[in-house]
Amino acid sequence: MIQQESFLTVADNSGAKRIQCIRVLGSNRRYAHVGDVIVAAVKDAMPNMSVKKSEVVKAVVVRTKATLRRDTGNSIRFDDNAAVLINEDKNPRGTRVFGPVARELRERNFTKIVSLAPEVI
């Protein structure tokens, strides 16, 4: 579960390395899970890239350490909390996605992120 002040790694090549959650978007929501959109501040970024440190960005959560229960009864858990930066049209800002992503992103209409990911679990 991601909440305010949580740190996430960035799973794309937009230029940001780590982000910190400022707000979970939605009607007064406290926690974010896989597929939820958050507002975050860039805490660590690569030089000479489009995303700069201390920039406020939107991101979609693609992996969480918290166990994700599926309707089939399966549960899945990742090794890290990760997000992909998105623009206003909900398209990824980077051109590559690193690491596996959860299948729930396809149900939330983030098909571009799913198609860029090397593995969908």
From Swiss-Prot:
Biological process according to GO: translation
Metal-binding is among the record's keywords: no
UniProt keyword annotation of DNA repair present: no
Entry superkingdom: Bacteria
Molecular function GO terms recorded: large ribosomal subunit rRNA binding; structural constituent of ribosome
SUPFAM superfamilies membership: Ribosomal protein L14 (SSF50193)
SMART domains with a match to the protein in the record: Ribosomal_L14
GO CC terms: cytosolic large ribosomal subunit
Record key words, sorted: Ribonucleoprotein, Ribosomal protein, RNA-binding, rRNA-binding
PANTHER family, alphabetized: 50S/60S RIBOSOMAL PROTEIN L14/L23, LARGE RIBOSOMAL SUBUNIT PROTEIN UL14M
Function noted in UniProt: Binds to 23S rRNA. Forms part of two intersubunit bridges in the 70S ribosome.
Family, similarity comment: Belongs to the universal ribosomal protein uL14 family.
Subunit organization: Part of the 50S ribosomal subunit. Forms a cluster with proteins L3 and L19. In the 70S ribosome, L14 and L19 interact and together make contacts with the 16S rRNA in bridges B5 and B8.
Protein name (record): Large ribosomal subunit protein uL14
Organism: Prochlorococcus marinus (strain MIT 9313)
Higher taxonomy: Bacteria, Bacillati, Cyanobacteriota, Cyanophyceae, Synechococcales
